[in-house]
Amino acid sequence: YGTRFPKNFRPEHISYRKEESPEELAVINYTSGTTGYSKGVMLPYRSLWSNVAYCHEMLPVRPGDHIVSMLPLGHVFGMVYDFLYGFSAGAHLYFLTRMPSPKIIAQSFSEIRPRIISCVPLIVEKIIKKDILPRIDNKIGKLLLRMPIVNDKIKADMRKKAMEVFGSNFDEIIIGGAPFNAEVERFLKQIGFPYTIAYGMTECGPIICYEDWTRFKPGSCGKAAPRMEVKILSS
């Protein structure tokens, strides 16, 4: 080692393999099959690059920020967003060592305080229904919500409590992978909680639509990502 690298190992010693074409196969990712039967999806470098580049353009992760990786890396969103994007952004990646139950996930948020969170709806729904909604889901709480001044204070308090449950350090929560509970979504919108809903599939590597939480419209899944062609067809 000392003979080959007399002045230590430096960036110029690194030689990455260069693909012959952006269309060259990068990974075969197995999926249950949004567009049909279960299959191995052949994703080219172009697809992975486009997704990672879009994350850099739209999401506020900076070197040293924390990301909790909850999805398995065999899941295309976990691979592209949590790993490839987080790694290339210089973030610190934290992997759960136990099955990701809502309790364990909430504990990890409190300890790690991630900058941005991506998860399936069920996680947000269970945490909100268990730790936040019971505080106002009673006769007194519902009565106070009808009083304008008190209503604003309650919403501010609920937002603060909800932020604390998820670590208090995040810019937004990106939700996707399944329909979001309408009751929970209405509540989060009422208290001004920073969430957004995105849409994608393995075949697209995976991001198709996304919008920043400040411009996100409830009931939607954002706008088409750059370099992505979206066509709406009738049934």
Could you tell me what each predicted segment is?
Residues Y37, G64-H66, G90, E164-D171:
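Short, surface-exposed connector motifs at secondary-structure boundaries
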Residues E19, M42, S118, A224:
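Short aromatic/basic micro-patch
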Residues L25, T31-T34, I67, I117, ...:
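Conserved S/T- and glycine-rich ATP-binding loop of Class I adenylate-forming
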Residues K7-Y30, Y37, P60-H66:
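Conserved pre-ATP/AMP-binding loop-to-beta segment of ANL
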Residues A26-S50:
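Conserved AMP-binding A3 loop
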Residues W49-H66, L73-K160, P194:
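Conserved AMP-binding/adenylation subdomain of ANL enzymes
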Residues I117, I154-S235:
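Conserved AMP-binding/adenylate-forming
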